Amino acid sequence: MQLNQKQFKLSFVTASILLASSVYAQDYVRVNYMQYDENDNRVSVKAPSIEVNKDFGVDYTLNVSLVTDAVSGATPIYVDSISGASAFNSRGDNKTPIKKNVEFTEQRTSASFSLVSRLDSRDEITVAFSKSYESDYDANTLSIDYLHWANKSKNRSYNIGASYALNNILIKDCSYNAQCGAPDSVSGASKKEISNILSTEVGVTQLIDKTSLVKASIFYSTEDGYLSNPYYNVVRYTNKIVAEVRPDKRVAYGFNLKYIKAFTSTISSKFKYKFYTDDWDITSHTIDINNYYELNSKVTLGFGIRYYTQSEAIFYSKDTNYFTDEVYASHDDRLSSFNSTTLKTSVDYKYSKSLSYNISLDKYDQSTDLSAMYTTVGFKYKF
């Protein structure tokens, strides 16, 4: 069947996701500003970002990005109703627990780079490094991925990748935390903890026809070290406030499915599904659907929905009369059983061949009575 000109364009976009060669590479600068606001003015995030992608000949592509965000607001933590102004100075016996929004501010900066190297066979090796830093958390991640073309027509590829993350957790105030030792001489923290994350993923991508593509992958990850949140408290025996304690190991695995389809000359969609499970008894399902409508040669509209659901961790409870002498205990709602829905809209405006503008608005609702709005505006310049 012969495709019209617009379908050829959509087919090219679809194929370029699979055919990661310099023929389809772009040199560009992307600048965005993201604003995130939770309901009841709980948490607000302002995050400007910049990304640069540069192709060096036919064998190398470099990508560099920088994000800096300012976070402010309050997070619900169990504190003593009489003396509790923070997570730490509320800890002890004979307390009167109350869940209170404790205010905080944070400045966070993260940077990443990746380098794609293409071999004579046009197989690809991608090496990437990212670093994220804030006053009490320092994350460093190194990853490598190998992509192999199954045949000369390049309609199928296999990839295998691995990453290692080293996280430094700086606990600033441990006056009431018996686990804390002498202050860290470099950071000034009361205690310096670390955690390690090792992840692997294996996948296959298949170009079905000129308008559709499918990708499937499986993943496995292990975490060890300090996996608790130093600011979260747990109520034991109804009147004792102590630091939460999570296991120091975590093993997770699952799979991802992706399907991309150009239905008509102006309508295309991306379907994603993710299954995740771990030995903390958390199992989650994620369904993500994004649809795009090309209104004309300059304007593309986007709309989508993301649904997420998970079961609760084996050591989680929301009740203050639940925990006694259990080894592991947490009141963190992120470990609870919940579901969430995100509604997404976007507009992309192509001002010229080299310059385009974008704006998107996402509405997030979670069954734990949390809701938020994401707004992103920016531009992309091809050079």
Regions found by a protein language model. Give the residues of each.
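Transmembrane beta-strands of outer-membrane beta-barrel pores
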Residues: 33-37, 68-72, 129-135, 148-150, ...
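Outer membrane beta-barrel transmembrane domains
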Residues: 83-101, 219-221, 227-256, 277-288, ...
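Extracellular loop and loop/strand-boundary signature of outer-membrane beta-barrel proteins
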Residues: 35-38, 97-101, 128-133, 143-147, ...
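Repeated loop/turn-to-beta-strand initiation elements of outer-membrane beta-barrel proteins
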Residues: 27-29, 59-62, 121-127, 153-158, ...
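Hydrophobic, lipid-facing positions within transmembrane beta-strands of outer-membrane proteins
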Residues: 46-50, 109-113, 140-144, 158, ...
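Cleavable N-terminal export/targeting peptides
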Residues: 1-28, 178-184
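Residue-level signature of outer-membrane beta-barrel architecture
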Residues: 54-56, 117, 148-150, 206, ...
